[in-house]
């Protein structure tokens, strides 16, 4: 509103007193009308944006855009962590992306446990692995909605699974090699597709859960040096050995998320590699989901004991987002994205790239049906009693039997009649 300056001649002290009395009242009344209008407009704007992003009749892209456009820079940056906080004024609930499902729903109470990934790879059975992943996603959905009904929202209760691990197991010193499907690129690619399809479901509208292909790329231990390793790889080895499984995950399974690795590839941190994240993942493969860092990987950019590729957390955060990393897994000193606001102010990064990252993240949550009525989401009705059901337990026994491989028969088979087997240890009677 345009401000006016009043110039009224005052003849007497009485008039002066009257003018002094009335003028503050006029200012006060004007001030009321000025402050109320913007407040009402802002409230109406927020209500309209809420109506838009919750309107299931609108295209998904329009709903997400309405939500992101209504957020402040600080709110958007806060959503770029695995433990994204609630935005109460917009009705956005808190969400933690951290969950695992390599061979069963992890860390969320009891669940059916299948053999570790390296064992399931030994089955050489795409269809059965897909069935196993379907069981895992059934149980994950059932658990998620049970938590939701109780008002519980915490780490490991979500629907974004940081699985499968489709790295190539080349180095026997890698203590987590059992999480992979082994050292064969073809087998790993085929099984990765089967597992991802089982996790994500086959509905045309909604994701059952969101799978994450990890760790992109050339990551295979040993663990002790994973934060500082620099793997120098030829194009031939990169494209024939380390990348095929990721290409299949994107092209054949439409995987929703990719986790970038701790290590450097040809001198560049994987989570800051334009070659990996822009040129290969998005341009060559056509990936349109979100990219998240392994936990603490962005801090490795400037950590003297790690890559020390840059000196400041702000530069590291801007570098990662500029290269295409959308989500930072990290807390405390590892939470480098806390410096993104400073990076925007200093011109290290444009806010439009923050918008792009947050849009990708919310697209995943919307695809999972998190902002729609449960009645619209087909997977929301999976009963909790499916968790650990007899059918699922029978499948895990079958998987265990199929995973056993005898490399050399030194008189072991056939088993002699009457032989006794001792089962020793605290889990001997654990179903």
Which ranges hold each PLM region?
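Intrinsically disordered, low-complexity Ser/Thr/Pro-rich tracts
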Residues: 14, 18, 107-109
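Intrinsically disordered, low-complexity serine/threonine-rich segments
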Residues: 9, 26, 36-38
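Bacterial N-terminal signal peptides
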Residues: 17-30
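Glycoside hydrolase catalytic-domain context in secreted enzymes
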Residues: 32-431
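N-terminal secretory signal peptides that target proteins for export/translocation
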Residues: 1-13
């Amino acid at each position: 509103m345009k401000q006016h300056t009043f110039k009224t001649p005052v003849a007497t002290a009485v008039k002066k007193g009257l003018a002094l009395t009335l003028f503050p009242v006029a200012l006060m009344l004007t001030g009321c009308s000025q402050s109320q209008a913007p407040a009402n407009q802002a409230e109406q704007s927020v209500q309209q944006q809420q109506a838009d992003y919750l309107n299931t009749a609108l295209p998904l892209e329009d709903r997400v855009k309405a939500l992101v456009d209504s957020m402040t820079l600080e709110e958007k940056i806060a959503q770029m962590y695995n433990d994204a906080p609630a935005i109460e004024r917009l009705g956005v609930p808190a969400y933690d992306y951290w969950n695992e499902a390599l061979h069963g729903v992890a860390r969320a109470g009891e669940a059916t446990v299948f053999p570790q990934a390296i064992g399931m790879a030994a089955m050489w059975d795409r269809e059965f692995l897909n069935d196993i992943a379907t069981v895992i996603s059934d149980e994950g959905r059932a658990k998620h909605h049970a938590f939701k009904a109780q008002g519980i929202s915490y780490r490991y209760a979500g629907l974004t699974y940081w699985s499968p691990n489709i790295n190539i197991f080349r180095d026997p010193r890698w203590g987590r090699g059992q999480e992979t499907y082994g050292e064969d690129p073809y087998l790993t690619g085929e099984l990765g597709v089967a597992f991802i399809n089982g996790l994500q479901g086959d509905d045309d509208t909604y994701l059952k859960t969101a799978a994450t292909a990890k760790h992109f790329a050339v990551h295979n231990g040993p663990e002790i040096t994973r934060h500082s390793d620099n793997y120098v790889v030829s194009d031939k080895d990169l494209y024939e050995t380390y990348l095929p499984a990721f290409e299949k995950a994107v092209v054949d399974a439409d995987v929703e998320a990719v986790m970038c690795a701790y290590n450097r590839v040809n001198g560049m941190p994987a989570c800051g590699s334009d070659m990996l994240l822009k040129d290969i993942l998005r341009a060559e493969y056509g990936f349109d989901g979100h990219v998240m860092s392994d936990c603490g990987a962005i801090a490795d950019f400037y950590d003297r004991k790690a890559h020390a590729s840059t000196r400041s957390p702000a530069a590291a955060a801007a570098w990662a987002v500029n290269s295409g990393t959308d989500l930072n897994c990290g807390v405390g000193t590892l939470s480098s994205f806390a410096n993104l606001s400073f990076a925007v102010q200093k011109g290290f990064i444009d806010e439009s790239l923050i918008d792009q990252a947050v849009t990708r993240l919310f697209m995943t949550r919307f695809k999972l049906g998190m902002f729609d009525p449960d009645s619209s989401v087909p997977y929301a009705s999976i009963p909790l009693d499916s968790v650990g059901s007899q059918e699922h337990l029978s499948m895990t026994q079958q998987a265990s039997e199929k995973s056993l491989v005898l490399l050399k028969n030194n008189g072991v088979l056939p088993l002699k009649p009457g032989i006794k087997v001792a089962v020793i240890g605290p889990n001997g009677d654990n179903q």
